Swiss-Prot record:
<dbReference type="GO" id="GO:0019843">
    <property type="term" value="F:rRNA binding"/>
</dbReference>
<dbReference type="InterPro" id="IPR019927">
    <property type="entry name" value="Ribosomal_uL3_bac/org-type"/>
</dbReference>
<comment type="function">
    <text>One of the primary rRNA binding proteins, it binds directly near the 3'-end of the 23S rRNA, where it nucleates assembly of the 50S subunit.</text>
</comment>
<keyword id="KW-0687">Ribonucleoprotein</keyword>
<dbReference type="GO" id="GO:0003735">
    <property type="term" value="F:structural constituent of ribosome"/>
</dbReference>
<keyword id="KW-0694">RNA-binding</keyword>
<dbReference type="InterPro" id="IPR009000">
    <property type="entry name" value="Transl_B-barrel_sf"/>
</dbReference>
<keyword id="KW-0699">rRNA-binding</keyword>
<dbReference type="InterPro" id="IPR019926">
    <property type="entry name" value="Ribosomal_uL3_CS"/>
</dbReference>
<feature type="modified residue" description="N5-methylglutamine">
    <location>
        <position position="154"/>
    </location>
</feature>
<comment type="subunit">
    <text>Part of the 50S ribosomal subunit. Forms a cluster with proteins L14 and L19.</text>
</comment>
<protein>
    <recommendedName>
        <fullName>Large ribosomal subunit protein uL3</fullName>
    </recommendedName>
</protein>
<dbReference type="GO" id="GO:0006412">
    <property type="term" value="P:translation"/>
</dbReference>
<dbReference type="InterPro" id="IPR000597">
    <property type="entry name" value="Ribosomal_uL3"/>
</dbReference>
<keyword id="KW-0689">Ribosomal protein</keyword>
<comment type="similarity">
    <text>Belongs to the universal ribosomal protein uL3 family.</text>
</comment>
<dbReference type="Pfam" id="PF00297">
    <property type="entry name" value="Ribosomal_L3"/>
</dbReference>
Amino acid sequence: MSVMRTGIIAKKLGMTRLFREDGTHVPVTVLHMDDVRVVAARTKERDGYAAVQLGFGHAKTKNVTKPMKGHFAAAKVEPANRLVEFRVADDAVLEAGQVLSAAHFTVGQKVDVAGISKGKGFAGGMKRWNFRGLEASHGVSISHRSLGSTGNRQDPGKTFKNKKMAGHLGGERITTLNLEVAAIDEARNLIMIKGAVPGAKDGYVLVRDAVKTARPADAAYPAALKA
């Protein structure tokens, strides 16, 4: 059995906590799958690679362009608010119109979650890269939070590309690995992930099987679909 099955797209609702039977509690992030359905399938014979295109939510018809209206009409599905594509194995390609369930993942399973991190604006080296900063006294004037040397002297006499310096922080795609699925609410299409996931509230995240941990044997393959 191949390990490459589709992931899912979900909206981050926020954080809460779950209580266990022994009285302890665990912080969780609640993710909502809003009618996640297959919009298109990619096959090696036709497209050169195998993948599944998923749609999330529902878009207003007036906001959908004519080319995209034709794309959704060909799949016989309603226009989606978001589209995302996952590479899959040849035997894990799904048919257009199929709807994924929150039971796609199992409790205790490890997953990787990708999202757009919160934008922090322009940040200095200490906040952006955890630099130590300079001395608080002992001859240091006005440069307590500065970077220090960036280009040496005559040799090399320049600042190398990708040097860690002050600049824009956040607002980029971040993937957190090996997060644990704490609970599943299949009736309400909710997935609860232990701990924090990247991004702000109401942001979109991609959840897939962990690449560094084996998929549970009882996980649905190629996907958990709604009847």
